[in-house]
């Protein structure tokens, strides 16, 4: 997914050495992510340093698996998610989730409506809306951490 791709490319551009140990789909589900993480913990153990989850439920599933495996807060991999859901915000406060990303839901809705109206009436994207590769419109995201809970 683009979220993971851009997260990893940002680390590489910053000079962080990376090694991808594993990747799998968990269909945005906490339970499925927990199953995958349990498998990886058996396979890779403490070699897992970072988990990029493409939504908060999957990040929480990874945390569940780590907790079940007996990992304390200080032993957890660096786990991040996306969406800034209430359960993820609680995990941030507890110190089990390192960060999440808040989507701009209002901006997304406004962009979708603007795009739909413009495409249906004019056949082109709205003026001023930048479209990448003919398919993508980039929206604002906010990093959320325990130190910056408001993003």
Protein language model regions, located:
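Conserved functional loop/turn residues at catalytic and ligand-binding sites
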Residues: 15, 44, 96
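Hydrophobic alpha-helical
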Residues: 7, 21-22, 26-89
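Hydrophobic alpha-helical segments within soluble ligand-binding/sensing domains
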Residues: 2-9, 31-36, 59, 84-88, ...
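Short beta-strand elements at the ligand-binding edges of bilobed clamshell
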Residues: 23, 94-106
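Class I S-adenosyl-L-methionine
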Residues: 5-15, 63, 67, 93, ...
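Hinge/cleft segment of the Venus flytrap/periplasmic-binding protein
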Residues: 9-14, 107-151
């Amino acid at each position: 997914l683009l979220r993971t791709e851009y997260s990893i490319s940002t680390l590489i551009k910053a000079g962080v050495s990376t090694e991808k140990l594993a990747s799998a789909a968990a269909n945005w589900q906490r339970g499925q992510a927990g199953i995958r993480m349990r498998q990886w913990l058996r396979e890779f153990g403490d070699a897992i340093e970072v988990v990029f989850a493409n939504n908060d439920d999957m990040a929480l599933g990874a945390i569940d698996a780590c907790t079940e495996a007996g990992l304390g807060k200080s032993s957890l991999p660096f786990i991040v998610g996306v969406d800034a859901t209430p359960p993820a915000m609680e995990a941030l406060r507890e110190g089990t989730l390192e960060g999440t990303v808040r989507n701009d839901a209002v901006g997304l809705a406004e962009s979708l409506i603007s795009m739909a109206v413009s495409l249906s009436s004019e056949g082109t994207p709205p003026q001023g809306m930048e479209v990448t590769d003919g398919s993508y419109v980039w929206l604002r995201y906010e990093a959320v951490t325990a130190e910056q809970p408001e993003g």
